[in-house]
Amino acid sequence: MIGQRITIEICRASTSELVTVDAWRTATPGVVVHESPGGIWWAATHQRSGTVIATFEDPYSAMAFAAAIGEFDWTRSGAALVADPAVERCVIRRKRELGALVTVFNGGPERARRLSI
């Protein structure tokens, strides 16, 4: 993988469980790439909140997605990013272009607490 390896805590959208994973920094500050806990897919994740933005079949597509959404300041809180309609439009467009597996930038009950981080 390209980028510095770090450890982050992510919030599983299906269960709101917090899980620690190894991740890699990307060219976009605030966005990291990691393998899913079950090893099924790769995700581009908002580092500050641990919220998955999009999932892909391979790490290279996830890295390309992270670079493609780099026009925004991903070091902001998750709440600020979710509230920005331009971010949402860009994320949806880039997911379609790069073949994301799942459309996410959410979470379960844990979301409200995590997004403020």
Where in the sequence are the language-model features?
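Short aromatic-glycine-(Arg/Gly/Cys) micro-motifs in beta-strand/loop hairpins
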Residues: V33-T51
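Negatively charged, low-complexity tracts enriched in Asp/Glu with abundant Ser/Thr
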Residues: M1-T26
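A short, exposed loop/beta-hairpin motif centered on an aromatic-Gly-Thr core
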Residues: Q47-S61
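Charged, amphipathic alpha-helical segments
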Residues: T26-V32
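Intrinsically disordered, low-complexity acidic regions enriched in Pro/Ser/Thr
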Residues: E35-W41, R94, N106-E110
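Non-catalytic tandem-repeat scaffold regions and their flanking low-complexity/translocation tails
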Residues: G30, A62, E71-L98, F105
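Short intrinsically disordered terminal tails
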Residues: M1-I2, V102-I117
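Glycine-centered tight beta-turn/hairpin loop motif at sheet-sheet or coil-to-beta transitions
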Residues: S14, T28, R48-G50
